[in-house]
């Protein structure tokens, strides 16, 4: 069942005037990652307090979605019978946290309490990071080493093997079935990022099952296509309302003679480097949202932010598209129009100018909390000073919820409190999951204005 409210108690408060041009609907997300060791070995009570502090800070500057990393290297930051507890949580792979704690369940509850979405984020194909040397007995490297390809200090699931794709989709099905998540998210790691002249040795797999392909690059892209299609349908068959999204590397393809519709860039590409054909997935309807990681600054010689923002706006039609923003790089850049400032305002303005973009996602969340060069302050006071609803996903099934029933206001010593009953709905997809309260001094004012949102 989707999380929904039958009776909601709200104490009305005064709305502070702010920028009326802020959109009513906008994705405002942030990635909370485990791979940076920020959780490792911290006692449960202390980690709960730290995560709550971060969520308070992020909600306080207007964010409405959290992408929480729950799988780093074929492990789990949640209770799982399929993969071991993550060393990035407890310090030792396979060791459970104290107090019988489930970080994913905790984050779902805390995000929903703050009216934020929670998207469970997994790294699909990485089986081992560079620093891991010990593995739990039930880790896939121990159980099925024949399905793993070593690449330098990394180890990855061979994307060509149906057994591996099935296993990752089984992980997705388990999470979607057992947890009240709002979204399921995978990042940019498909085939590995190149390391010098190091070769990803899948020659044996290609020889064994080329699937009719003569070109290995096309074969690899097909392997990833099959995975994306399978995991999308895995999520949707269980809970069609759970949004499935991907955050690919920021360049799809560079513009060339052979591909004139690419971006005016000269950097590393998804299509030829990671074998990730993002536009094909969008065309096939296998993504609900896309967050290209456009982590560079405007003025970058091979990957200009402004060029890429416009390119994604123009080319990702049919899919909600949000820009991945690198906080720390942004504050080191110089605004091309205001050299006394960093590039934060410049980038956020571009996102709202281009019609094919519907929001931003910030990397990493901790950087927003730490507020370098007043980054969080600018969000809270200028760009996200009024709440925003999630963008409408017109392509999802379901009908608009009906009107609330039995609405009444009760005076209390703390002020007026509203009560109502949820609208009736025959199907799960037709149920209301959140409510918005507006206060209008004059009925002529529009509920489309975020100024009037409580």
Predicted regions and their residues:
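Aromatic-lined carbohydrate-binding/catalytic grooves of carbohydrate-active enzymes
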Residues: 63-99
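Pro/Thr/Ser/Gly-rich low-complexity, intrinsically disordered linker/stalk tracts
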Residues: 374-430
């Amino acid at each position: 069942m989707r999380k929904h409210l039958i009776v909601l108690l709200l104490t009305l408060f005064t709305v502070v005037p702010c920028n009326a041009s802020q959109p009513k609907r906008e994705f405002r997300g942030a990635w909370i990652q485990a791979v940076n060791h920020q959780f490792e070995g911290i006692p449960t009570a202390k980690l709960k307090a730290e995560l709550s502090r971060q969520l308070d800070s992020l909600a306080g500057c207007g964010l409405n979605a959290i992408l929480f990393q729950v799988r780093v290297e074929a492990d789990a930051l949640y209770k799982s019978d399929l993969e071991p507890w993550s060393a990035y949580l407890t310090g030792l792979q396979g060791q459970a946290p104290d107090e019988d704690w489930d970080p994913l369940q905790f984050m779902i509850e805390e995000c929903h309490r703050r009216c934020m979405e929670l998207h469970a984020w997994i790294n699909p194909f990485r089986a081992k990071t560079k620093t891991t040397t010990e593995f739990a007995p039930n880790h896939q490297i121990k159980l099925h080493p024949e399905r793993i390809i070593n690449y330098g200090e990394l180890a990855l699931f061979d994307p060509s093997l149906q057994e591996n794709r099935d296993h990752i989709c089984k992980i997705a099905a388990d999470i979607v079935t057992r947890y009240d998540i709002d979204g399921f998210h995978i990042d940019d790691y498909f085939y590995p990022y190149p390391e010098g002249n190091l070769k990803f040795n899948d020659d044996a797999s290609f020889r064994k099952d080329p699937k009719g392909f003569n070109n290995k690059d096309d074969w690899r892209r097909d392997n990833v296509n099959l995975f994306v299609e399978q995991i999308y349908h895995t999520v949707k068959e269980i809970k069609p309302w759970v949004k499935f999204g991907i955050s690919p590397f920021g360049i799809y393809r560079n513009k060339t003679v052979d591909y004139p519709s690419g971006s005016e860039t000269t950097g590393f590409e998804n299509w030829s480097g990671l074998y990730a054909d993002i536009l094909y997935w969008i065309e096939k309807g296998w993504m609900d949202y896309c967050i290209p990681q456009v982590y560079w600054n405007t003025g970058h010689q091979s990957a200009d932010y402004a060029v890429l923002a416009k390119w994604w706006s123009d080319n990702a039609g049919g899919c909600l598209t949000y820009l991945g923003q690198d906080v720390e790089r942004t504050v080191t850049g110089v605004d091309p129009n205001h050299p006394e400032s960093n590039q934060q305002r410049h980038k956020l303005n571009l996102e709202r100018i281009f019609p094919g973009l519907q929001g931003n996602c910030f990397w990493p969340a901790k950087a927003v909390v730490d507020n370098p060069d007043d980054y969080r302050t600018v969000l809270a006071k200028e760009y996200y000073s009024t709440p925003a609803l999630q963008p409408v996903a017109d392509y999802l099934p379901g009908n608009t919820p009906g009107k609330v029933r039995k609405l009444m206001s009760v005076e209390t010593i703390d002020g007026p409190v509203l009560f109502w009953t949820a609208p009736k709905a025959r199907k799960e997809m037709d149920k209301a999951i959140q409510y918005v309260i507006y206060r209008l001094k004059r009925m002529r004012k529009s509920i489309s204005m975020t100024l009037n949102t409580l």
